[in-house]
Every structure is written in C-alpha cells, then in structure tokens.
Amino acid sequence: MQINIVPEFKNDRDIDAVKSIINNCVHCGFCTATCPTYQMLGDELDGPRGRIYLMKQMVEGAPVTEKTQNHLDRCLTCRNCESTCPSGVRYGRLVDVGRRYVDERVVRPLSQRVQRWLMRETLSRRGIFSFLLGVGRSVRPFLPATLKKKIQLAPSAGQWPAATHKTKMLLHVGCVQPALMPNVDAATARVFDKLGVELVIASDAECCGAIRQHLNDHHGAEDQMKRNIDAWWPHVENGLDTIVINASGCGVMIKDYAEILAHDPAYADKAKRISAMAKDVSEIMPTYAAQIGTLAQNKRQSATPERVTYHPPCTLQHGQKIRGSVETLLSGLGVTVRLCQDSHLCCGSAGTYSILQPALSQELLGRKLTNILKTEPQEIVSGNVGCINHLQSGTDVPVRHWIELIDRMI
C-alpha cells in the first residue's frame, strides 16, 4: 500500500514507522475475519483494513474528523489481526500512533476529556486507585448492578513468603492488580519460593505505562516507563536478569519499551535491556515443569478442580505471541484444560475499553461467556487482571489467575 506523506507529518518522530507499517499492508482483508469489532458492526471502517485506510488518508492530507476518531476509538487493540496477517503488519503500533495523530487534531467533547483524564490519573496511580477502590468497596451494596459486579470484594492474598534464595528475579506489580487482586502477586511469590526463587519488588516501580499510552498520553506513558527503568536498573546492575510479569497487558507494554524509547539517547540502551528481561510467568514456568510436577504429586491437593477452561488473554496470545504453554503446564499436572469456541477472540475488557465502550464490551463479554460456559468449567482461569475482573463480572463460576491454581496444587 503506497503512501505519500504530507509535510505536516514528515517531521513526526513516529512517521517512518507509520509509513513502513502501512506499506506492508496488501489490503487482502484476512484481518477482517478475526476482528471482533468488524464481526459485531459489519462496517469496513471498524476493521483493521478500514482503519489502516483512514490512517493512510490522514497522513496523506485528508481532513481528520470525529468519524476517524470514533472508528479508531472502537478498536480493542486486541491485535488478533496481527496473528492473522500474512504480511506481518504491526497494526497495534500503528493504531497507537494513529490515535495520537487524531487526538492532536480533533478536540474531544468535554465529557470525554474529563473521563479520560480521570482514568489516566487514577487507574495508573497505585495509591490513588487503591484508596478509591476501598471507597468503592465500602459503598458496594448501593452501587448500580453493572458497577457492583466490577468492584469485587477484596480477596485474601495469603502469606507472602519470608524465605530468601540465592536465585532472584524482579517482579513487576503494576498499578491496578495490587489493590484489585493482591492474591495474584502473593500466589506468584509463593510458587517461585517453592521453586527456590526469590521475587524482588522495586519499591519505586509503578504503572507500566499502558493505560496512558492507550489513552494517547504518550509523554506521560514514557515518563512512567523511564521511572520504571530507573527503579529496576540498580537491581539489573546487581545481576538480576529477569522481570517476572503475571499480567500480560503489562508484559506486552514492557516488551515494547525498547521501541518506544528508541529515540531517547539517555534510555534507549537501558530500555532495550529491560524489554529483553521481561518475561510473562507462562514463559518461565515450563522451565520448572518437572519440579512443579513433583511438588504437586507430593501434595496431592484434593481441592484442585478437575476441569478448567482457560481464556488466553489477547495481550498474551496475540500481543506476545505466547500460545499453548499454560494449557500444557496444567494438563501435565492432571488438570483437564479446555479452550472455548473462538478462544482467539477478545473478552471485551481490553484495558480501559470496558469503560469507554461499555455496550461493545458487554456484547463481547456475553459472547465469550456463552462459549466458555458451554465447556462446563469448574473454574475459569486466565493470565491478565483485566480479563479476570471482566469475566468474573458476568458469571458466578470462579475466575482466577492460572498461577493461583499452581499455588494450590504445590
């Protein structure tokens, strides 16, 4: 797809990437077959190919309107299209930049600007989010049903391991998960402890930057990325070489630090190192599969469910291209693991999407849960805090992180 950039965009730092990505698109349309919003709305402009046309027209000088903004807003950034594309079009990177271009040229209504500011300043700040979540939980009985389902009561985190080990890895804890689901980090730490690995938390590390990045506050996102690098770097210099991530939405973001900060001479090399160190917990566990199997056999936990349905997060299967490792690990422990029909499709959480596009998000949730419940699971497991919370809001079947299942078994 040839492209002729107008002078207005030629000096933008991301325009070379935009041009390269658009040039790779051969407009074959394979992406539309797996795009959730195209399937729901049936509009070419609500599929990846149509959105690429809109972004191409924009940088070639076509007027940028609310119509362009709305079609890009409705994209989940699930990156299912990237898994389908035979040409390797990096659509997720393109739409992030395209949204920034649009927001720099189309002023949003005041209500949208306020909503997005509130999300940026609360969800991405651990202390503020924790406080507000506590307030929400205290008034939960009086909240509307849809909001009540989103604000679950605080789960018990259990004991954090006190032992120290020679082998150490960093654990990224992020912004939302410590308050919303502290049990996930604690379970992760216990599993690694039993495997002889101590997880270290850098106290000054914060949100990975994904929330601000996807809400088009790219400068704010990059500031958070740099602060994280600064927080982790002393540990890197002390020999730690792995950052364990148990929220795949954070993982896909941290793995992109290298590209996003490539323009910054003070951080480019460090960002490249950090991205290489970032590992989803599902990338690490297979190394310890035999040890986990022995521990599980010795414990013989009768409370372990016999049948679970695994929902692979989009940020894991499409964003990080990690597939099959969770199912293989759990199956090796004797758990019957099922995938539902259309397991490649998004559940509708998609970070802040469930807040910004509630109708589309709820339709996707309904479709996903209909397919999941057909598998008759005793538990539903996933690997991302947003997916877990979103799925749990629509069903009484327990939804947990799969690492919690491992924690119970060993």
Predicted segment positions?
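Non-heme iron-sulfur electron-transfer modules
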Residues: 1-10, 37-70, 88-117, 400-406
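Iron-sulfur cluster-binding electron-transfer modules in prokaryotic oxidoreductases
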Residues: 14, 91-410
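Cysteine-centered iron-sulfur cluster-binding motifs in ferredoxin-type domains/subunits
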Residues: 19-38, 69-89, 315, 344-345
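Generic N-terminal leader/targeting and pre-domain segments
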Residues: 1-28
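N-terminal, well-ordered alpha-helical segments
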Residues: 33, 53-57, 70-73, 79, ...
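N-terminal glycine-rich anion-binding loops that anchor highly charged ligand groups
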Residues: 29-33, 43-47, 199-201
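Short His/Asp/Glu-rich catalytic/ion-coordination signatures at enzyme active sites or charged loops
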Residues: 60, 84, 216
